[in-house]
């Protein structure tokens, strides 16, 4: 670089020599540095040399600056002949002037001056230990870790001693990290002792306190331990080219394997990265691309047992230029624009220097973002300009030269400029024509700007050459302005005229003061106000007028106060009453506009122990944000639980309350509109009552200048897009408005949960990018987002609101109630319940199972099930093995912990065949065998004997009931009526048929029939027999037997028959897949006789079976275990101990047809019943179904 700079300087010198005869062209040699000072760390009394060598056209003068001020040279500090600064003895003791600071050298020649980069001189120091090693006990074979931390400049070198001797680090199991951490893996008895760290710098050496390591003998039994990270990586911020170490120490049995990855799935740089010790990640020569989130993962070999820890690496980078300023040549009265852009982490700040001195934006010279604009160039602007970019990592500078070309035939400057005030906003400016070449003047330009303050904008008005006076209006009242005139001709512009300053007249105030209302007692209101800003005061305020009244009274009371006052106490007021107050200010010209009425309620007379009103202060930060600050009275003894904040725009609805803690003394209100007046009230509260409130008004400033008030705001950002990133963060992206050409300053993001009640939870974030990751959100919560744009002191409206929900949290617990049932010789059913927690979302279950031999080898078989399922089949199990089963729940965010291991014993084939099946094993039955399930032969024998005894007892009870029923029917039958609704709605399941009684007429009207219960006579054959029908009275003759199909009964005819009552008993026999047919017989009976109705059922339940589904490829599992349908389960639960048989039934095949036809027609259709089989043919049944 120095050689290239010399060549460039030589080339420019040659070009300057060639151009020397040409009029109006100057030759010059640019000034540049060959060597610049660098950062230095020195000990006290050391000698230091700060280099500085500049090249350019001689003579060159070098001066030194310290912290922006000139270095005072003496015998100890002076400049060498080559421009370097020499300090013979560095001082820095307390009580003396320290030499520490930032140094810069300034090189100057006749063309200008340049400033070097900053050099930071620091003294070598070392502090006391911030963290010292602690004593610990470690089991033999475990991991021991000691740490110490000390602040030093430069960073201290840390070594370790054991028993006051240097610890040898040649063993692989001992690692000493440069960060001050000592790791000992596979601890042995000989490692026991006293450890301490030693920190050494260039100036001193410090030793820490000793820590004892006790080694406990290891037990013979080494149970399985899940991996655990006992020392994970910490967030690190590093400078460019430094070395970073991310620590990761894990324990477990078997010993876990440590691996590293990046959270963004980018590959880790293998050239600058290596593993230090037993899992620590060391990154050498850190670069910006190394920044990110690093994940340490500790995994038990051969298993899915792992744990992770992560940390963020932030890399800071010094500034570097992306765009450099270029040298310019401009004529007098022209405009020069220098561009400069730099990047770095954090983002660098851009500033401009002219001949080594910082430039402030004012008048003709403006700085827009990182650009420098010089308007109305004058000869004094000919200089060397430098763009300086600096951040916490350093500073860089880039230079450019502005050459001002002067015309030889230009006119002289206008003279005799004078100004006269016309009004509060207008000044008359007059001047004389130039004395030289005035006949060539074609126009004049009038320049004016405010005389007070910095960063004032200069305005320009161009007028013709036919006049020498001009009235400038649109000025602010009671303000000083500076004016000058420039004459123009075809070949260029004249020099500036002399400057003249003039003051505008006063005017009435443009607005009223912002008032604050508080109460010290139930009968007073303290009114205080701030001075009106000079911009709106428009002169000196001489009077204030206070007006107040009760809200229920139209009578107004008025007080006038001197302009020097800033508060007034209203006394003798009514307690617990609302008062309205307003204020007006006046200058010597007259009264301004009064403020709007501000309301305030006086405290209740009983609120003597309520918190006093806080002292409130409001301050606008910008045109959309205000800061609310308050201070509670120190004499207030009332307890304060918190504060309530309310705010509203004048004439709008109030927002709040915003609940704040008792420790809060400041709050920022964002998202306001520019040039609006807002009313804020604040009060303290406790468990008993609310305190006295403080009210105050504030006005937000405008975002545009007076001349730009008609400029419309920019359109809002478009295409706002939200995507959930984690359970606590959402990624936002949006587009810049297509019709906005202005430079975007930043964006404001508004974020809050949907349906938010507390306005203090609204989050406002700032960024200059078109994307942002919003963090710190609640899981599984819907948020609303909006974005607004800020450009050139203008704010856009809020974008349309976008709603998005954060992801749920990963399951925090394992599935519960894990049960295992052996349903076949080689098949087991696993069932479980979802993890505890109402907010837990599960999308998938992972089932791990393995035999003991496979488990020891770390080989698990894996099954996955959807989150809606809570059972699975384990197939192809090997007899004689004990299987271990555990389950974990997971969702799209992550996987939860596994459940406790449940053991399942699969008995040998010969043993399992002698036992009854199925065998049900669950975690709730485990006692001495720790989730081990086993049903031996004796247990199964006992179960079988118990079931047989129960069946025998039930059979005896049924026989007794049948015998007694026969006896009752013979003596005195009782009327029974069956509900037709029950018959129609049971749909084969008639468990409640003996609960309700109805008359036979009711049954006939509903086209349903009840059959007589057939007693258990031995001569009745269920498979077939004669046409003889027998009821409880004996055989029924053909004359008295009339068979009617239920579907074809004539109910009207039945009603007209003689009033007789028939005994009806229903007989049924159910088999899966068949339909019951019942017929009714007419039996002679008295009108008062009725029969009992009983419908016993015996339904054989199907065994459990597996539906076809896609299974796990690892095990060939069918994929799911399906229950019976709901109807079948219902039927199987409604069983009777006594099956009944009769010959009055059709065959199974015929019953199936009738069943299918009847049920498919309608849910309300009754079942088809027939009385006896011989009289009914399949043709008749088929005909009946068709009808």
UniProtKB/Swiss-Prot annotation:
One of its GO terms (biological process) is cell-cell adhesion. It is found in: Membrane. It comes from Gallus gallus (Chicken). The chain crosses the membrane at residues 942-962. May play a role in anteroposterior axis elongation. Residues 413-507, 509-605, 610-709, 716-809, 814-909 form the Fibronectin type-III domain. PROSITE patterns: FN3 (PS50853), IG_LIKE (PS50835). CDD domains: FN3 (cd00063). This is Protogenin. It holds the Pfam family Ig_3. The keyword Transcription regulation does not apply. Keywords: Developmental protein, Disulfide bond, Glycoprotein, Immunoglobulin domain, Membrane, Repeat, Signal, Transmembrane, Transmembrane helix. It is a single-pass membrane protein. It comes from the Eukaryota. Residues 963-1187 are cytoplasmic. Glycans are attached at residues 82, 163, 235, 305, 465, 480, 622, 725, 746, 758. Its main location: membrane. The gene is PRTG.
């Amino acid at each position: 670089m120095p050689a290239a700079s010399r060549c460039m300087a030589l080339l420019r010198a040659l070009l300057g020599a060639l151009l020397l005869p040409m009029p109006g062209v100057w030759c010059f040699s640019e000034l540049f540095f060959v060597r610049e000072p660098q950062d230095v760390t020195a000990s006290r009394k050391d000698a230091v040399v700060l280099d500085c060598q500049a090249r350019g056209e001689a003579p060159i003068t070098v001066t030194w600056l310290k912290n922006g001020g000139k270095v005072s040279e003496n015998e100890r500090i002076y400049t060498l002949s080559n421009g370097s600064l020499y300090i013979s003895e560095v001082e820095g003791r307390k009580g003396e002037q320290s030499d520490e600071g930032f140094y810069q050298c300034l090189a100057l020649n006749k063309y200008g001056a340049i400033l070097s980069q900053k050099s930071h001189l620091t003294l070598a120091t070392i502090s006391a230990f911030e963290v010292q090693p602690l004593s610990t006990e470690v089991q033999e074979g475990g991991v021991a870790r000691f740490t110490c931390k000390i602040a030093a400049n430069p960073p201290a070198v840390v070594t370790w001693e054991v028993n006051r001797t240097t610890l040898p680090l040649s063993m692989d199991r001992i690692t000493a990290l440069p960060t001050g951490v000592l790791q000992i893996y596979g601890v042995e008895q000989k490692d026991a002792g006293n450890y301490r760290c030693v920190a050494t710098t260039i100036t001193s050496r410090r030793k820490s306190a000793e820590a004892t390591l006790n080694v406990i003998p290891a037990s013979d039994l080494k149970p399985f331990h899940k991996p655990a990270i006992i020392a994970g990586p910490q967030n690190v911020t590093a400078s460019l080219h430094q070395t970073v170490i991310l620590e990761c120490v894990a324990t477990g049995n078997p010993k876990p394997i440590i691996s590293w990855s990046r959270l963004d799935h980018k590959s880790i740089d293998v050239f600058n990265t290596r593993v230090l010790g037993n899992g620590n990640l060391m990154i050498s020569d850190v670069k910006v691309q190394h920044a990110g989130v690093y994940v340490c993962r500790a995994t038990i070999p051969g298993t899915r047992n792992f744990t992770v820890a992560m940390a963020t690496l932030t890399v800071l980078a010094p500034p570097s230029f992306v765009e450099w300023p270029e040298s310019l040549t401009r004529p007098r009265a022209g405009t020069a624009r220098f561009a400069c852009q730099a990047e770095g982490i954090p983002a660098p700040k851009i500033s401009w220097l002219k001949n080594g001195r910082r430039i402030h934006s004012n008048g003709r010279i403006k700085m827009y973002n990182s650009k420098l604009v010089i308007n109305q160039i004058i000869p004094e602007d000919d200089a060397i300009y430098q763009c300086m970019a600096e951040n916490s990592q350093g500073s860089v500078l880039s230079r450019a030269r502005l050459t001002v070309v002067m015309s030889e035939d230009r006119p002289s400057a206008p003279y005799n400029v004078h100004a006269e005030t016309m009004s509060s906003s207008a000044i008359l400016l007059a001047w004389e024509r130039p004395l030289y070449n005035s006949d060539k003047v074609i126009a004049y330009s009038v320049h004016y700007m405010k005389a007070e303050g910095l960063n004032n904008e200069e305005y320009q008005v161009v007028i013709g050459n036919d006049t020498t006076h001009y009235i400038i209006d649109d000025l602010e009242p009671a303000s000083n302005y500076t004016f000058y005139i420039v004459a123009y001709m075809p070949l260029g512009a004249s020099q500036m005229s002399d400057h003249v300053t003039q003051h505008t007249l006063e005017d009435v105030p443009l607005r009223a003061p912002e008032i604050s209302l508080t109460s010290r007692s139930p009968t007073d209101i303290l009114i205080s106000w701030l001075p009106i800003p000079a911009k709106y005061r428009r002169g000196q305020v001489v009077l204030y007028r206070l007006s107040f009244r009760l809200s229920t009274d139209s009578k107004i009371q008025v007080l006038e106060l001197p302009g020097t006052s800033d508060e007034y106490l209203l006394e003798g007021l009514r307690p617990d009453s609302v008062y309205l107050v307003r204020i007006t200010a006046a200058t010597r010209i007259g009264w301004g506009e009064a403020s709007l009425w501000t309301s305030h309620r006086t405290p209740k007379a009983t609120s003597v122990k309520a918190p006093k009103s806080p002292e409130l202060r409001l301050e606008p930060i910008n045109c959309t944000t205000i800061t609310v600050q308050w201070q509670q009275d120190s004499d207030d003894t009332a307890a304060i639980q918190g504060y309530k904040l309310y705010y509203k725009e004048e004439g709008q609805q109030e927002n709040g309350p915003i609940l704040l803690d008792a420790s809060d003394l400041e709050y920022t209100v964002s998202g306001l509109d520019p040039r609006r007046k807002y009313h804020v009230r604040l009060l303290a509260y406790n468990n008993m009552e609310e305190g006295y409130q403080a009210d105050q008004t504030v006005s937000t400033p405008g975002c545009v200048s007076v001349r730009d008030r008609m400029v419309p705001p920019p359109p809002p950002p478009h295409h706002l897009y939200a995507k959930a990133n984690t359970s606590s963060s959402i990624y936002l992206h949006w587009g810049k408005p297509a019709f906005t050409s202005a430079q975007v300053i930043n964006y404001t993001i508004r974020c809050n949960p949907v349906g938010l009640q507390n306005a203090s939870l609204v989050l406002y974030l700032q960024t200059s990018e078109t994307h942002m990751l919003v963090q710190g959100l609640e899981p599984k919560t819907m948020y609303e987002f909006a974005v607004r744009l800020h450009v050139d002191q203008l704010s856009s409206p809020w974008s349309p609101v976008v709603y998005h929900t954060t992801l749920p949290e990963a399951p925090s617990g394992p599935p519960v109630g894990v049960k295992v049932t052996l349903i076949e010789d080689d098949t087991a059913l696993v069932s479980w319940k979802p993890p505890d927690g109402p907010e837990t979302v599960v999308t998938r279950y992972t089932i791990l199972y393995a035999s003991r031999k496979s488990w020891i080898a770390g080989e698990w078989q894996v099954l996955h099930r959807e989150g809606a399922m809570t059972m699975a089949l384990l197939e192809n199990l090997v007899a004689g093995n004990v299987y271990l089963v555990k389950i974990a729940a997971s969702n799209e965010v992550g996987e939860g912990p596994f459940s406790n291991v449940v053991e399942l014993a699969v008995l040998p084939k010969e043993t399992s065949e002698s036992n009854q099946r199925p065998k049900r094993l669950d975690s709730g039955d485990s006692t001495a065998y720790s989730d081990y399930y086993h049903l031996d032969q004796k247990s199964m024998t006992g179960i079988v004997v118990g079931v047989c005894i129960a069946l025998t007892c039930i059979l005896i009870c049924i026989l007794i009931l049948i015998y007694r029923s026969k006896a009752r029917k013979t003596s005195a039958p009782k009327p029974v009526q069956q509900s037709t609704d029950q018959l129609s709605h049971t749909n084969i399941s008639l468990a409640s048929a003996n609960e309700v009684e109805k008359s036979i007429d009711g049954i006939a009207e509903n086209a349903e029939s009840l059959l007589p219960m057939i007693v258990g006579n031995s001569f009745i054959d269920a498979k077939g027999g004669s046409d003889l029908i027998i009821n409880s009275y004996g055989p029924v003759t053909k004359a008295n037997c009339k068979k009617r199909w239920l579907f074809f009964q004539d109910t009207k005819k039945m009603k007209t028959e003689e009033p007789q009552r028939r005994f009806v008993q229903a007989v049924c026999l159910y088999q899966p897949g068949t339909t019951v047919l019942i017929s009714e017989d007419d039996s002679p009976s008295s009108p008062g006789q009725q029969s009992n109705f009983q419908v016993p059922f015996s339904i054989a339940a199907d065994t459990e079976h597996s539906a076809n589904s896609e299974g796990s490829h690892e095990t060939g599992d069918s994929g799911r275990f399906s229950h019976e349908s709901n109807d079948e389960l219902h039927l199987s639960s409604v069983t009777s101990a006594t099956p009944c048989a009769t010959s009055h039934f059709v065959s199974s095949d015929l019953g199936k047809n009738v069943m299918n036809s009847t049920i498919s027609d309608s849910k309300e259709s009754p079942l088809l019943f027939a009385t006896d089989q011989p009289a009914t043919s399949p043709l008749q049944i088929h005909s009946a179904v068709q009808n």
